[in-house]
A protein has these predicted regions:
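Serine-hydrolase catalytic-loop signature spanning alpha/beta hydrolases and amidase-signature enzymes
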Residues: 19-22, 44, 84
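Primarily recognizes the serine-hydrolase "nucleophile elbow" in alpha/beta-hydrolase
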Residues: 83-156
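Hydrophobic beta-strand anchors of alpha/beta hydrolase catalytic cores
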Residues: 12-14, 44, 160
Length: 199
């Protein structure tokens, strides 16, 4: 529901989970989360994205190309959705300096990866302006895929809140990698954030 005043509102963008092969942005179990933020004065945007793992086998340390492609597609779609909000921020009454991204499982991987790639000016970051950065990240059981070991940021990441169960069998709580290539989960990222005094 849009605020009828002219006051600009912070925005929460949410990316659903489902292993990059299923899920829906309007699933009933997400509605309380959306409503919580809407009542706090946020414009809530539930993002849809291409499901790149449909028809693919589960990723392994030696065969993760389909997963890498799926993450890239999701990040690209999140960037495109963000660009739309930036373009129409006036009409939507969104404060573009207060756009927070949040996601669950595959969605959490997407939002963490998106902020990581944006802060590092990676090739995927051609959709959004160089001057734009997300204001915050809320991750429910996410991680970052890296080919260079534990992810390092050229620009400090957005303030990030991690939620992750240590018994997670799908998204690694710590990390799952072969040599330096693999998925770095919430525990390893949180330790890195603490070491580097990231927010």
């Amino acid at each position: 529901k849009m605020d009828s005043s002219d006051t600009l509102q912070p925005c929460l963008m949410f990316v659903f989970g489902g292993g990059f092969k299923q899920g829906s942005r309007d699933a009933a179990h997400y509605l309380p989360y959306y409503n919580h933020f809407a009542k706090k004065g946020f414009t809530v945007v539930a993002v849809d994205y291409r499901l790149g793992m449909i028809g693919e086998k589960a990723a392994t340390p030696l065969n993760n190309k389909p997963l890498v492609r799926a993450i890239s597609l999701a990040v690209e779609d999140l960037y495109s959705a963000t660009e739309y909000l930036l373009k129409y921020a006036g009409e939507l009454k969104i404060d573009t300096s207060e756009i927070v991204i949040s996601g669950s499982s595959a969605g959490a991987i997407t939002v963490l990866q998106a902020d990581y790639e944006k802060r590092n000016n990676m090739p995927s970051d051609t959709i959004l302006s160089n001057t734009f950065q997300y204001a915050g990240v809320i991750s429910f059981a996410g991680g970052i895929f890296s080919t260079e070991g534990l992810p390092v940021y050229k620009i400090a990441p957005a303030p990030t809140l991690f939620f992750h169960g240590s018994a997670d069998k799908l998204v690694p709580y710590n990390h799952r990698s072969f040599l330096k290539r693999g998925m770095y989960g919430s525990e390893s990222l949180a330790q890195s954030f603490k070491l580097n005094a990231y927010p």
